[in-house]
Amino acid sequence: MKFIHAADLHLDSPLRGLSAYSDAPAEQLRTATRDAFVKLVDIALDEAVDFMVIAGDIYDGDWKDFNTGLFFIRQMGRLRQASIPVYLLYGNHDAESDMTRSLTLPDNVHVFSSRKAETFAIESLKIAIHGRSFKQKATTENMVPNYPEPVPGWLNIGVLHTALEGNAEHATYAPCTVSELEAKGYQYWALGHVHERSILPEHRQAGQTVIAFPGNLQGRHIREQGARGALLVTAQADEITDIQLLEVDVLRWQQLDVELGPDDDMASALQAAGRALEHLLA
């Protein structure tokens, strides 16, 4: 059994910092978040995954262009044609989006309630997926204590949009600790909100709870450097057996440090920057 864990799509969120450059690839910049998500859906179809989990922030705050929502519906429709269900919750950005309340999603998409945590059961696979959506952007309560108890003998997946302890640079929405997640007794926590990928524990042993942020699909500015994407998770019965990184970003941000001497002029600086860039792309 395998599934995709994604989060923080931020569809149609603008890529910032390149508008001052006339030769920037304007069309690629405009469609980057969409193109990354199309690549992810392509992988889901090629891999014939059993389902997809999206842990919040599909949309980008108060973005009001309904074409964004219609695009998302079309991609969900592609998965529906392949009989791939999607389990998603709404995060802080979705909670303030008009599209969250106004658009009707295909019947293969299952959305967690914002009233209380609930469970979607895939009986044929003995999988229980637990989660709760944000009702409002500033959701500062710890949701974990009210998540359902794990189903004995099944693979239990918790879906949560949270800052988690140790991520002070992110708004402290739905705060919780690693120990609280571990104590819940789920085998896998599919988290969202933090845009950097992390998988805990780093050196996993059999039976340990996996706590994972996939990061966002597409870096949007220089503070979101390096490869971006999602996670392909494989399980056998009630045990997580493998986690594969899926790089789907179509543009990548990277800061390069170039050493210059006191006698170097602009031409030397440009040559050094060029060599550093060639080394990065090699």
Question: For each predicted feature, which ranges?
Answer:
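Catalytic cores of large soluble enzymes that bind and process phosphate-bearing ligands
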Residues: 29-32, 36, 47, 64, ...
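A generic secondary-structure signal
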Residues: 39, 43, 47, 75-78, ...
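His/Asp/Glu-rich metal-coordinating catalytic cores
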Residues: 51, 62-242
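Short glycine/proline-enriched loop/turn "hinge" motifs that connect secondary-structure elements
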Residues: 44, 149-151, 246
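C-terminal functional module detector
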Residues: 225-228, 234-282
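Generic alpha-helical structural signal
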Residues: 34, 38, 73, 271-274
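N-terminal active-site segment of His-dependent metallophosphoesterases
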Residues: 1-69
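Acidic/glycine-enriched edge-of-secondary-structure segments
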Residues: 25-32, 128-133, 254-270
